[in-house]
């Protein structure tokens, strides 16, 4: 199947401006296409992956993706999908975020070979345009009536929208025009909330370059979970691509915990597995859901794609250790990843009796309860049961002098940091 057929099978297309024309174009030649992201933060989250996975699919099909980092538009703020004004950021913060997002993109895309990916920053061609040029060369081509009718603006008319954010769609249209004339970009991809911005770009190109210009727009559906909530959030908030914000273990766990009703959809959206392999996994979901094979494959594919093979192996190792309760083989760094969200306590490195120590930390409510739990075999330290109420806790019991893990019962873990 060609790239458009594949995207349709994966359920990845929401709207497109000219399906027949785009299908014909990609069959005739390898095209350049672009997708942009504004540096509103110093990391992308998994919601950002959706359009960029599509870009990656085009790359694998031999087409030429152009990734735009919005160093200019990021200083303005996209009103799409928002009920209020964005807080303007300083140029220094924006540049820091540009650098961080650029580094993340370089991990996701192959920047060499026959289907080379280009990275551009719209600040490079926008910052020298003065206000007179902006109004004469670009503003003249936009009707206030049509701009007000765009959903991104119309939804904000009651609550208010600044002139700054109102003109955002012009800046994005200028980007498409620039990339069309300088990089031969003929297709823009974006989320479902970008339809108005994308069509503004198409209109501008045709006004400036002629109606025969072959340019297209394509948006991706808003991805909702089976319970109707928006995809991309965990109990702890957004799931980030930055391993300092969301560890590879947490990232892996997010995908492993996917609902049976969603996992096949996610395999289509996010992985590069073949239709045959996904169909096999879909059968497993129906016939052997308890094995969660589809979820494990999804988690493996995504963790490897974003964080690499080594981080995947580490995430699997931590998962297996937590499941079995055998955590002795873990390193201190793996302990830090795996127990990040567990109840955490602080202790000195001073040697103490286990009963006194558990009560002082607040893990046990009383000495009597601590002794009872130890005598009943309910307390484990670093994966080994504590059987003697006279046991001393020393720094030698810790992982690399940093952590001690206490398990009370079968599942109640606590992380004790020494310092």
Swiss-Prot record:
Q: Which GO terms describe its cellular component?
A: cytosol
Quaternary structure, per UniProt, is: Homodimer.
Tell me where the sequence motif 'HIGH' region sits in this chain. 39-48
Q: Which residues take part in binding L-tyrosine?
A: 34, 168, 172
State any GO BP term from the record: tyrosyl-tRNA aminoacylation
The record places domain S4 RNA-binding at 352-418
EC primary class:
ligase
**Gene that codes for this?**
tyrS2
**Cell compartments where the protein resides:** Cytoplasm
Q: Which GO terms describe its molecular function?
A: ATP binding; RNA binding; tyrosine-tRNA ligase activity
Kindly name one Pfam family recorded for this protein. SYY_C-terminal
What protein am I looking at? Tyrosine--tRNA ligase 2
Catalytic activity, as annotated: tRNA(Tyr) + L-tyrosine + ATP = L-tyrosyl-tRNA(Tyr) + AMP + diphosphate + H(+)
Similarity comment: Belongs to the class-I aminoacyl-tRNA synthetase family. TyrS type 1 subfamily.
Residues given in the record as ATP binding sites? 233
């Amino acid at each position: 199947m060609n790239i458009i057929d594949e995207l349709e099978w994966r359920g990845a297309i929401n709207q497109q401006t000219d399906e027949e024309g785009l299908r014909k174009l990609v069959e005739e030649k390898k095209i350049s296409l672009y997708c942009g992201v504004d540096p509103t933060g110093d990391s992308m989250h998994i919601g950002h992956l959706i359009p960029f996975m599509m870009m990656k699919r085009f790359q694998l099909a031999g087409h030429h993706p152009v990734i735009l980092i919005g160093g200019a538009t990021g200083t303005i703020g996209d009103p799409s999908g928002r009920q209020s004004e964005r807080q303007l950021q300083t140029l220094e913060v924006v540049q820091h975020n540009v650098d961080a997002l650029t580094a993340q993109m370089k991990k996701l895309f192959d920047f060499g070979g026959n289907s080379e990916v280009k990275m551009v920053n719209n600040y490079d061609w926008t910052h020298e345009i003065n206000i007179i040029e902006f109004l004469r060369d670009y503003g003249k081509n936009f009707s206030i009536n049509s701009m007000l009718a765009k959903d991104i603006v119309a939804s904000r008319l009651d609550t208010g929208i600044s002139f700054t954010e109102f003109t955002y769609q012009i800046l994005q249209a200028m980007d498409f025009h620039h990339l069309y004339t300088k990089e031969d970009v003929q297709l823009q991809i974006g989320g479902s909330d970008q339809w108005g911005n994308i069509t503004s770009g198409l209109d501008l190109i045709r006004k400036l370059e002629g109606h025969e210009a072959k340019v297209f727009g394509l948006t991706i559906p808003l991805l909702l979970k089976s319970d109707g909530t928006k995809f991309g959030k965990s109990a702890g908030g957004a799931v980030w691509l930055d391993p300092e914000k969301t560890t590879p273990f947490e990232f892996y766990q997010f995908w492993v915990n996917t609902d049976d009703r969603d996992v096949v959809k996610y395999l289509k959206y996010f992985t590069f597995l073949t239709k045959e392999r996904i169909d096999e996994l879909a059968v497993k979901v129906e016939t052997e859901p308890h094995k969660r094979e589809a979820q494990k494959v999804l988690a493996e594919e995504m963790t490897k794609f974003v964080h690499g093979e080594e981080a995947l192996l580490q995430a699997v190792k931590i998962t297996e250790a937590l499941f079995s309760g055998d955590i002795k083989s873990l390193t201190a760094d793996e302990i830090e990843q795996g127990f990040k969200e567990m109840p955490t306590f602080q202790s000195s490195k001073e040697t103490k009796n286990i009963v006194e120590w558990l009560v002082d930390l607040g893990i046990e409510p009383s000495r009597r309860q601590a002794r009872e739990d130890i005598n009943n075999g309910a307390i484990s330290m670093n994966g080994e049961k504590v059987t003697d109420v006279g046991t001393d806790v020393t720094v030698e019991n810790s992982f690399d002098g940093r952590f001690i893990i206490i398990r009370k019962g079968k599942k109640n873990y606590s992380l004790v940091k020494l310092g």
